[in-house]
Design a protein with these regions (language model features):
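Divalent metal-coordination and catalytic microenvironments
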Residues: 8, 21, 26, 48, ...
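Active-site metal-binding motif and surrounding structural segment of the metallo-beta-lactamase
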Residues: 35-51
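A glycine-rich helix N-cap at a beta->alpha junction
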Residues: 109-125
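His/Asp/Glu-enriched, well-ordered alpha-helical/loop segment
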Residues: 197-225, 292, 298-299, 304-378
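Histidine/acidic residue-rich metal-binding segments in metalloenzymes
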Residues: 134-299
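Metal-associated gating/positioning segment near the N- to mid-region
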Residues: 49-114
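N-terminal metal-binding scaffold of metallo-dependent hydrolase/deaminase domains
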Residues: 1-38
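C-terminal cap of metal-dependent C-N hydrolases
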Residues: 8, 314-317, 367-423
Length: 423
């Protein structure tokens, strides 16, 4: 099947240009002015919209196998397509945990059967994500994008050192959820003013940055390619910035909710509960500074769906995690590109170029490349209504917020997997 996108604003080589894109047999075969199309080509007029390379999210929870009442590979990847993502990396907190070849194959089978975007699984660092014994990294290495115990911090320094040594030998990234259990003390939101005023148990910032400091030292000693998940504190940003200055092979990520909301926005509602928690204004400002100076390499969603019942128990008792695949680009475009905090090119780098460089997944808008692309109207605004999500998860702090930037279509390998009625 041939499809030609006509009169489009195309994001290519770091800027927008007016061009046509011809897609044939799943690949881009021509980009330019007045592209000549064979007679059997389906022409799509793209007005008031921009074609981007399909975005890359290296931190999502698809929940399958094991927790299909929260999300499935199918619903999660449909949500990804609805948000403009062509590639997602799936975290290993599943049942069974992908900690060996057999359990990983169960996840891969479901991906092959159900995914409508490209899915790259993580392998677990430890058996059962228990932090006691190293998983079978050698057996999983050919099939996984990286290794992580996301959802849990690796408490043992010796196990983390061993994991880093093995990841370096295998040429794999180790992506760490940094959380010191000894400092949690039953906390579930940031230990700031809101927690004190409303008698909630708080999570101190050191529970995150303390493990990052440990891991950065280990990465420097082992030479491991180290990636820090969902950075949320100002101290974490400072530690990573200094590590980069020393030449440590470290990258990091943060999410739209940490860049947008703070503890000042908290309500007694599970849609404001995630791990790590929403922090202070100073922490949020440090994250934005980290984006601007390159300390923070990429934006991810940490898309973590739960059932309606699990998120209806207030701040104290709700499950930790919010969804984000369907709002991520629009949230960042609205908060940072529209007001001139970030140029559009920087946002594309954070959501496509940088994760592609670091993790090796993603495609360019270029002749000969797979036709993985997304179409956004950057002038159209909408109010976030979670009941319209394609994800099974509905909990988001962006509910009711007006965002600008609507995904009109997503194409994967030349196949349209999401499309609004009109472009």
């Amino acid at each position: 099947m041939r499809i030609c996108f006509k009169h489009a604003q195309v994001w290519k080589d770091g800027s927008l240009r007016l061009a046509d894109i011809l897609v044939s047999d799943g690949r881009i075969v021509s980009i330019g002015d007045r592209v000549s199309c064979p007679t059997d080509t389906v022409c799509v007029e793209v007005h008031n919209a921009v074609i981007f390379p399909g975005f890359v999210d290296v931190h999502v929870h698809l929940r399958e196998p094991g927790f299909s009442y929260k999300e499935t590979v199918r619903t999660g990847t449909l949500a990804a397509a609805h948000g403009g993502f062509a590639h997602v990396a799936a975290m290993p907190n599943l049942n069974p945990v992908p900690d060996c070849k057999a359990s990983l194959e169960e996840e891969l089978r479901r991906i092959r059967e159900s995914a409508c975007v490209h899915v790259h699984p993580y392998g677990a660092i430890s058996v059962g994500q228990k932090g006691e014994q190293l998983a079978d990294l050698d057996a999983m290495a050919p099939e996984v994008i990286a290794f992580s115990d996301d959802g849990k911090g690796v408490q043992s320094e010796s196990l983390m050192r061993e994991a880093m040594e093995q990841c370096r030998r295998l040429g794999k990234i180790l992506a760490a959820h940094c959380e010191d259990n000894s400092l949690l003390r039953g906390g579930y939101i940031h230990d700031g003013a809101y927690a004190k005023t409303h008698s909630h148990r708080g999570i101190c910032s050191e529970s995150e940055w303390g493990q990052i400091a440990r891991d950065v030292r280990l990465a420097e000693e082992t030479g491991c390619a180290y990636h820090v998940c969902h950075v949320s504190t100002k101290e974490s940003v400072s530690i990573i910035r200094e590590a980069k200055r020393r030449g440590v092979n470290v990258t990091c990520e943060t999410g739209p909710h940490y860049l947008t909301f703070t503890e000042d926005d908290l309500q007694e509602d599970g849609r404001f509960k995630m791990n790590p928690p929403l922090r202070s204004r100073e922490d949020r400002d440090a994250l934005i500074e980290g984006l601007l100076d390159g300390t923070i390499d990429m934006i991810v969603t940490d898309h973590a769906p739960h059932s309606r019942e699990e998120k209806a128990r207030g701040l104290e008792k709700s499950a930790m995690g919010v969804v984000g695949l369907e709002t991520s680009f629009a949230a960042c475009y609205t908060s940072f590109v529209k007001p001139g905090v970030l140029p559009l090119g920087k946002l594309v780098d954070l959501m496509h170029d940088a994760p592609m460089r670091r993790f090796g997944c993603g495609t360019e808008l270029a002749i000969g490349q797979p036709a993985d692309l997304t179409v956004f109207n950057l002038s159209e605004s909408y109010v976030v209504e979670p009941e319209q999500f394609l994800s099974m998860g509905r909990a988001t702090p962006f509910a009711g917020v007006t965002l600008t930037g609507v995904c009109k279509m997503t194409m994967i390998d030349g196949k349209i997997v999401w499309k609004e009625e009109t472009l």
